[in-house]
Structures are given as C-alpha cells and as structure tokens.
Amino acid sequence: MVALYCGGGLRPLMLSWSRDLPCIWRALHTSAVCFKNRAARVRVGKGNKPVTYEEAHAPHYIAHRKGWLSLHTGNLDGEDHAAERTVEDVFLRKFMLGTFPGCLADQLILKRRANQVEICALVLRQLPAHKFYFLVGYSETLLSHFYKCPVRLHLQTVPSKVVYKYI
C-alpha cells in the first residue's frame, strides 16, 4: 500500500496514480522489507554435517586452497562475453542436475578449451551402467547441438558422497 503526500499542505491525501497535480510526490511503502543476506559458506554446526572439500573452504580461498569451478578465458582483460559464459554455466549446471537426478556427488567443473566444452563430475553409483551410458550420450548430443560445439562429459563414479570433514 502506498500513501501519497502532497507537499503543499499539512494533511495527507490519498491520490490516484495520475500525476496531474503540481506538487511534490512522496511515497510511503508499508510492506515489510525482506533482507536476504547470505554468506557463501557452510554454517558451522555441531560437527554432524558432512561437507566436501569445496564446501569446507570459504570463497576467499579460491586459487589458494581450492580451484575455480568454471575455467575459461572470459574474465581476462580485453575479453568479451563474460556474462554469457556465466549464464551458460548456470544452464549447464541446472541441466546436469536435472539429467542426473540425485546422482551428482559434488559440484561440476566446467572447462572451455578452444571450441570444446568439457564437463567433469563425480557421480554416485545409483543407476545401472547402461542408463549412465544413455544419459552421457543424450547429454553430449543435446548440448553439442545446442551450443554448436563439441561437449564432452568426463564422469567418475564413486560409491558414496566424498566427505572431507564434518562441520
């Protein structure tokens, strides 16, 4: 709800959305503010929350203790299309999460080398091998046609999620 106040007098007026009156417009928003501040790290708990190596280290340790999850030359000085690469990365991550539901053990690593996109992932052994082969072929073919460049999936299977430590 917005209550508008005309600056000429002492009484507030409820006005319509027309701006025909020659006065100063002020708006009072009465809806609650929703602050969404979130840290980019895993919250410390009672020591019973399993985390991976990537999750255990804070973001300021990138390039010191952990690596980048997306490797490309878009962020170098003088290079274009950094925003497009970020949108493509988000799409690729969501596509892989949807294609392999509940099977990804860790974050994806996306590499762009020349005209080729490589996707590296740790996958849980929840599906039979022939279903994994089908999903790999399906993903590579669909993404290659979509991006008009070769897309390769490098998957490594693990029996369970790799736990680095408990926080």
Swiss-Prot record:
GO biological process: mitochondrial translation
GO cellular component: mitochondrial inner membrane; mitochondrial small ribosomal subunit
UniProt-recorded Gene Ontology molecular function terms: structural constituent of ribosome
Location of this chain's protein in the cell: Mitochondrion
Domain of life: Eukaryota
InterPro entries noted in UniProt: Ribosomal_uS3m
Pfam families: MRP-S24
Keywords: Mitochondrion, Ribonucleoprotein, Ribosomal protein, Transit peptide
Transit peptide feature, positions: 1-35
Assembly notes: Component of the mitochondrial ribosome small subunit (28S) which comprises a 12S rRNA and about 30 distinct proteins.
Family: Belongs to the universal ribosomal protein uS3 family.
The protein's name: Small ribosomal subunit protein uS3m
Taxonomic source organism: Bos taurus
